């Protein structure tokens, strides 16, 4: 029988509810429990797929092809369970489902209201999401409720959580509330009043937290914890101090040392084995004691908001942990490269162009790719980064000076990258799209197995097959592949059904390490295992650094 831990937030957003939930889940998993996580987003969008990265950050793609909140990426990095579409849902999905039921007459003529119809639907989604993991036998499901207590958008979700707790009875539900304890420099002290008011607001809804996670820029002294305990009406040992850490992988140990997992297990009447966090300690030690150091230039248009590349940044850090390397990331605005300024690329040990959409900044990215190719700097292109590498090669090596993508120029003489109009999805179903199709939910999404060409860099990295996740509408145009191959490019992986290029590379005679992938490998990297492609990329950067030194 699955038990539930609801994780809520107060005072301000962006306190790290996702990291807190994932860290607690990691501790519970280390105690031998089967754990899953869900994220409830209060916005009315059906999913974040069409939301601006500047507003929402990264869109994380699950194995089954769902476009979800970036917190699901944290969940997969901290626990062994794979997230699915059912692990993330929004107000938009809830209302869409209820309205469909009303149109079908399932409510038998009743007036459809927020309570009970919307809140019942939320509960059904939560229980269905929890049942989708571990063959329906998860011991604990942690449910992160997006937004901040007091926001009107979050109220139906909080009410649904309260109703679930009442319906399931004691010891089936626990509540963890994350709040802010700011340090006021002019007063020289931490202020607990925002936390007091946040808990008061939560209790007005009918929810009393089992534990409080108090975020601050420093450890919270015992006297302040005692004060919070008094006003929040919870024991002092349930007031957990969560201070700023230089690595998110230190958080599980921080929470465990203060007994959060013990409190939750006692509340839920669970008696698992003691926590074993030795793996997390080993990862932190590897991160803090590197033997090498490199700098990678990430060339993109969302570089002012690194949340847009959250999984990619973490994947590079994981590769650093597994190669004893400190990976520094230099964020380079691609638009600045369009007018020159290529000198910023000279100190870099490697260059990376991540995924993205739209024409803005693409010519700057192409200039960075040309620099990497001509100066033998290790290069990794992901999704759009592979497409632009093909365009750059077509223009400057294969003689197609007008080469472009139809995403950026419909009139290009050489559309070496074009819209996918038909492909077979991971379940064998034929999908068809056109330029007039809706933007939402119409991309090639999810994991797909693809054979790899023998004797290539791709084969040395992945072996005979690659299984990675996709999120894109455009593909390398097969019509131009023979011309590109005649000029020296190697297409090292193709989809088995449509023969679409999945990986490209340059041979060793042209470049020491130049690889492009149409998929998103960052979505499957974990701190436990790293990722073979990113490890190979970091090793190539180290080799290039040695060549420069020599």
From Swiss-Prot:
Pathway: Pyrimidine metabolism; CTP biosynthesis via de novo pathway; CTP from UDP: step 2/2
Keyword set, alphabetical order: ATP-binding, Glutamine amidotransferase, Ligase, Magnesium, Metal-binding, Nucleotide-binding, Pyrimidine biosynthesis
Broadest EC class assigned to this enzyme: ligase
Family, per entry: Belongs to the CTP synthase family.
InterPro entries reported in the protein's UniProt record: Class_I_gatase-like, CTP_synthase, CTP_synthase_N, GATASE, GATase1_CTP_Synthase, P-loop_NTPase
Binding site for L-glutamine: 356, 384-387, 407, 473
Extra information: CTPSs have evolved a hybrid strategy for distinguishing between UTP and CTP. The overlapping regions of the product feedback inhibitory and substrate sites recognize a common feature in both compounds, the triphosphate moiety. To differentiate isosteric substrate and product pyrimidine rings, an additional pocket far from the expected kinase/ligase catalytic site, specifically recognizes the cytosine and ribose portions of the product inhibitor.
CC terms in the record's Gene Ontology section: cytosol
Binding-site positions, UTP: 13, 191-196, 227
Binding locations of Mg(2+): 71, 144
Protein name: CTP synthase
Amidoligase domain: region residues: 1-270
Subunit note: Homotetramer.
Residue sites binding ATP per the record: 14-19, 71
GO MF terms, alphabetically ordered: ATP binding; CTP synthase activity; glutaminase activity; identical protein binding; metal ion binding
Gene3D superfamilies noted in UniProt: 3.40.50.880, P-loop containing nucleotide triphosphate hydrolases (3.40.50.300)
UniProt binding sites for CTP: 13, 151-153, 191-196, 227
EC number, as in UniProt: 6.3.4.2
SUPFAM superfamilies: Class I glutamine amidotransferase-like, P-loop containing nucleoside triphosphate hydrolases
Function recorded in the entry: Catalyzes the ATP-dependent amination of UTP to CTP with either L-glutamine or ammonia as the source of nitrogen. Regulates intracellular CTP levels through interactions with the four ribonucleotide triphosphates.
Catalytic activity: UTP + L-glutamine + ATP + H2O = CTP + L-glutamate + ADP + phosphate + 2 H(+); L-glutamine + H2O = L-glutamate + NH4(+); UTP + NH4(+) + ATP = CTP + ADP + phosphate + 2 H(+)
